[in-house]
């Protein structure tokens, strides 16, 4: 039940949406910001971190070689080539991948439940990273001002907070507008860091020896302990890789690949090698090799450009968080959220106000608590390395069960990726005491919330199945004594086999039935989009009563009135009269009450709070306010 998203991927020849070049430009401004600013701190961390190496030719070449080949294997091959090829009908991100793996495995297997839990935990870790990225990225750039003008040091935190407030405030304009604004700046950024790298490499060409992977392998064999700690610094060069996959739904895999291979990867490597060449000439430059790479007359220009680039880096994780939240809500791991579509052409470009402002508050709290990028560096990496490892596992399940032609080769490659990522994750765990606890704690809290919502909604459904009246009993019972009023009643139901609570209360309190009744069941599919021809299924139940199934993909905004306009007659050639003047929509709002069994008291309280934050069914499904009747019901968990 899937279809391609119009105007998103730019792979076709039609004019639906932006051209491929415009999509690639926008992708540069949104997708690559995070990984594109890693030169600000990644290579420096190898020599100035808690377990920093001594600056010398052997160590510099080994660190560069390890960084180069790690980026090639994990980002250029695994993500840009392998992972982007395993999308969920054009949609990326770990939750979309989890839904795909779940669909391939089936609902009932124990292995399937494990995969779903792992995928949800990876999504929770991604949220932790999405909160840390804006804080560390903008801080690292603004700190460059203290190199140019030491008096600026006391203003680093206030300036950082001001920049972050501005960034989150323009999100309502949409990722398309933001991307078009940031895209040209990102191109200038990559060209400038590449130019600075080339200028340094020309002065010390021996740095090119690091292209040989033997430098990294020899260092790993001779200095195993140091190599293990080096992995956590090298990993910082790849922290934006997951955003490439998470944001794929905004711009399509082709735009991501063109941007990576055409500009981003060459520019990053030239700059890293330029920093390495600088350290070979001047060991004292290890304190901040990125900014010291620039000529003194260009330092302020680089600081301003780096600040702009780190704002863009934050955009990658912000837009990724929007996508993740929408998917989590559609797949049943979060309550209904208010989603604004910011483009008439690009369906994947969205803005979620609640997520936007919660992230801003969390990011500001981190900046005030840690105050420097160096303090946050230890916290950076654990969440992403865990998400990467789970992504590899999920792709492995999809490939194994999907039985593709290149299954053996792909699984072998994924096994190699997993071994390397286990090393990265283990190395990052050494930073737990220095701040690594933060993303794991954030991830655990979000994971508990996601699983609590899922478990709570399942318990509510079980409660209904246990206590509610089966629909078959209603259809078989005589209704001749019930007064009939004119008009059409549309009852929203979460389980078509049971009588909707709203109808039960309507009969109990008002003791009437409508002339025509429609039981509407909205089904969220595990695919991003649904063909219009497969969206509606109308089935007659008895005279004047219909069951209507309405299908939406997890990336679509459900719009019941718009979908009903496309309703066609049932098998008997009949169709309910849905005239707005005579049609009413009946919805039930559930109030959760703590009771014995089911969820623990604190999880029940959490579920109740999340339920109260949920957008109303009328707002969520875009029902006309003057046609909605809402009836409340209590559920004891």
What are these regions (language model features)?
Residues 1-637:
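The structured alpha-helical core of multi-pass membrane proteins
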